[in-house]
Design a protein with these regions (language model features):
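GHKL-type ATPase core
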Residues: 1-82
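GHKL/Histidine-kinase-like ATPase module
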Residues: 42, 49-51, 57-169
């Protein structure tokens, strides 16, 4: 299907395409509508990577470069670490959740959170609950009253949940 200025121009299928599955999308900026718009390719590339982390086996080709993830959010965490973690990342998957957690050598907390395949850079209820659960679990396991911020210092984690009828604020 070809669109221009919001109108459908053609509705056709590609002939001579070797692949029997998948979708080809090409976006060309309409200068009359967008002027001298330029893509922020760093942003687009990160979005493409996120889609592959969240959809195992999905291959996305951006400007001739293929992106694929074989290990989901584990690949995201490994790709974002700048040094060796303190321990091998813990990778947990369930029917509607995927979590990866480790600790690095730095300060602060690094979270990558997603709801229904959408990146939630500001976190959300799922991330807040995860942060609390990590601190509570460690405190209960060791039977110590550690400060939660000490437990979470240098944490690197990714969480993806699937939620029926999510509310984004």
């Amino acid at each position: 299907v070809t669109f221009s200025q919001g109108l459908e121009l053609t509705d056709r299928s590609e002939s001579g395409v070797a692949e029997q599955n998948g979708t080809y999308v090409e976006f060309v900026v309409d200068r009359e509508v967008f002027g001298d718009y330029a893509y922020n390719m760093e942003y687009v590339e990160q979005m493409v990577k996120n889609y592959t982390y969240l959809n195992l086996g999905l291959t996305v080709v951006l400007n001739g470069k293929p992106y694929i993830s074989k290990n989901g959010l584990l690949d995201l965490v490994n790709d974002t670490m700048s040094s060796e973690p303190l321990y091998a990342p813990i990778h947990i998957t369930g029917e509607d959740i995927e979590i990866v957690i480790t600790h690095g050598n730095g300060y602060g907390e690094s979270y990558y959170s997603f709801v229904n395949g959408q990146y939630t850079p500001q976190g959300g209820t799922h991330q807040a609950a995860f942060r609390e659960a990590i601190a509570k679990t460690i405190k209960e396991f060791y039977r110590k009253d550690y400060d939660p911020s000490d437990i979470r210092t240098s944490i690197i984690a990714a969480i993806s949940v699937r939620v029926d009828d999510p509310i984004f604020e």
